[in-house]
Amino acid sequence: QRCKDCLYKLAIAVMNQWPGVRLRVTEAWDEDGHHPPGSLHYEGRAVDITTSDRDTKKYGLLAQLAVEAGFDWVHYESKYHVHCSVKA
């Protein structure tokens, strides 16, 4: 539930920051083993995100907005997405 609440706040922040752009979730809950053992994706507490326009120049600020939205851990994991997670 906390992850969902943070995503909701972040989606609003993204729309306010960049009109016409939306938050894009590329990975969330996972059951197919694409993440390392112990990944919070298996518990529904982690998401990988981008912007709908996939403008990588926005991802630094996207990460900052994710922190402000309440995510406990935010990591600009690759040039393709930002990883966010919440504590239990």
Curated annotation (Swiss-Prot):
Compartments it resides in: Cell membrane; Secreted, Extracellular space
Keyword vocabulary terms for this entry: Autocatalytic cleavage, Calcium, Cell membrane, Developmental protein, Hydrolase, Membrane, Metal-binding, Protease, Secreted, Zinc
GO biological process, one term: proteolysis
GO CC annotations, alphabetized: extracellular region; plasma membrane
Maturation and modification: The C-terminal domain displays an autoproteolysis activity and a cholesterol transferase activity. Both activities result in the cleavage of the full-length protein and covalent attachment of a cholesterol moiety to the C-terminal of the newly generated N-terminal fragment (N-product). This covalent modification appears to play an essential role in restricting the spatial distribution of the protein activity to the cell surface. The N-product is the active species in both local and long-range signaling, whereas the C-product has no signaling activity.
Binding site for Ca(2+) 1: 26-27
Coiled-coil positions: none
GO molecular function list: metal ion binding; peptidase activity
Main location: membrane
UniProt free text on domains: The desert hedgehog protein N-product binds calcium and zinc ions; this stabilizes the protein fold and is essential for protein-protein interactions mediated by this domain.
Database matches in Pfam families: HH_signal
Provenance organism: Danio rerio
Xref: InterPro entries: Hedgehog, Hedgehog_sig/DD-Pept_Zn-bd_sf, Hedgehog_Signaling, Hedgehog_signalling_dom
Function field: Intercellular signal essential for a variety of patterning events during development.
Protein name per its UniProtKB record: Desert hedgehog protein
Family: Belongs to the hedgehog family.
Residue sites binding Ca(2+) 2 per the record: 27, 30, 32
Binding-site residues, Zn(2+): 41, 48, 83
